[in-house]
Amino acid sequence: MKDKYGREIDYLRISLTDKCNLRCAYCMEKDHNDFIHNDKLMTLDEILRVVKECASIGIKKVRLTGGEPLVREGIVDLIKNINKIPEIEEICLTTNGILLGDKVKELSENGLKRVNISLDTLKEDRFKEITRIGTLDKVLYSIEKCLENNVKVKINTVILEDFNKDEILDLINLACENPIDLRFIELMPIGEGKKFKGVTNSEILEIIKKEKKVLSDGKTLRLNGPAKYISIEGFKGKIGFISAMSDCFCEDCNRIRVTPEGFMKQCLHWKYGINLRDKMRNGISDEELREIIKKSIYEKPEKHNFKMKEKDEDKRFMYEIGG
């Protein structure tokens, strides 16, 4: 269906949990352990009900996020049941990759088509520093197992000033040697991210162009989503740029988000939305739920305003919202 600005909304991002097995520095405080109580999370049945009603009004693609979605029990059955919904064409997962390698075969057999894996460095010491408790080898193993099981892979990378800027060329080589896409995501001022200085994608692109032969004269191509892509000579995959801060893509936004506790967010930046979990637990019918979702989608804000401090911005951390 379309929102009031005429954008076709066909993509649902639904967070299964705020819990995570890492403590990435720009996402979560090092000693954080105060997560949403299980009784406040949407149940798997409630999640499935939301997906079904969204599918009935035009949602075609579902992405499961977190926190780390793979720490949520029952995720395989959830994917299996979502895959049974006729209108859903694609099920995807965003993950840090730590737990994925040993689960990807079963997930794929039950309907998972794509994964986005967060990876900001190829140096073990830096990986430990940024994630605080992670092991790089497990992420690389997960990428390998995804390719073995024909699950399409995108790598999401955040470049931070004075941390991993010197690894840009090493990171893009992942897309040279493998049929995967690597996307640079500009750091957004959400939660712990406000404490760090990111690098703009225009600067990253210039670094790449100095060392690699970029096809199509270096022009970026936007496909279905916020990323703009370039092709590099000899590369099996593409390089993408998600430039939320320097190149607003809101006019093409096609998504709606649901947080772990069932709050349907109309925009990543703004706090506007409605709690679907509470409505369901108060006994509303499927038809009533569908109408609430339709109204929420229709009222999506025109654009974010991350560059300005606003009284109506969402103060929550990314892991609480759903990355």
Swiss-Prot record:
Monomer and homodimer. Catalyzes the cyclization of GTP to (8S)-3',8-cyclo-7,8-dihydroguanosine 5'-triphosphate. It comes from Clostridium perfringens (strain 13 / Type A). GTP binds at R13, R63, T94, K154, R255, I256, R257. This is GTP 3',8-cyclase. Its cofactor is [4Fe-4S] cluster. The keyword Nucleotide-binding applies. It comes from the Bacteria. GO terms for biological process: Mo-molybdopterin cofactor biosynthetic process. [4Fe-4S] cluster 2 binds at C250, C253, C267. CDD domains: Radical_SAM, Twitch_MoaA.
